């Protein structure tokens, strides 16, 4: 199975992929849109579906004016040096400024993002509560509390950028994603199947695979 990298449009195979913003990338193609530094899955900012490093680029382009991530002072930003492979100079006009937010009438549901004096926070897709910068992890293009990023089926806590997804919902790779959406023909070990889904042993490509350090027998 392979995917198409959003950056270079070349195939991405399982062994070389990293997942971020709901897409699969080559590891070295996941770069900041502005300064082209290599980013870690789940450890970067995003705007309009594009990845940015938190500082200085996201803060300089989209952060509250005059306040940095820590809430004190101003962003000090020097334009980045273009990488050797980049021949087109970047200019501020190539980035769309954030649109001003308008207030909601009383009684309306709050938007998925809210403004605070320290910047912008998001609402966690898992629990619906605000996610602040110091506690967030990013996956599938959204910000989560770390304990809320769980497999939809077995509820195991997941690591950002190291899990599967289907229709924007996170799943562990094995066994849940394979069980629900993988090629048909796999089945749980007969000793562990009693009309209920048992996640510890899984039959893949003719082999019994032990998961989470449970013994196979």
Swiss-Prot record:
GO cellular component: a single term: cytoplasm
Subcellular compartments: Cytoplasm
GO molecular function per UniProt: metal ion binding
Pfam families named in the record: LIM (PF00412)
Tissue/organ expression: Expressed in most tissues, but not in skeletal muscle.
Organism: Homo sapiens
Record-annotated LIM zinc-binding domain positions: 3-64, 122-183
Keywords: Cytoplasm, LIM domain, Metal-binding, Repeat, Zinc
Protein's UniProt name: Cysteine-rich protein 3
Coiled-coil ranges (or none): none
Region annotation Disordered: where it falls in the sequence: 84-112
InterPro entries given in the database record: Znf_LIM (IPR001781)
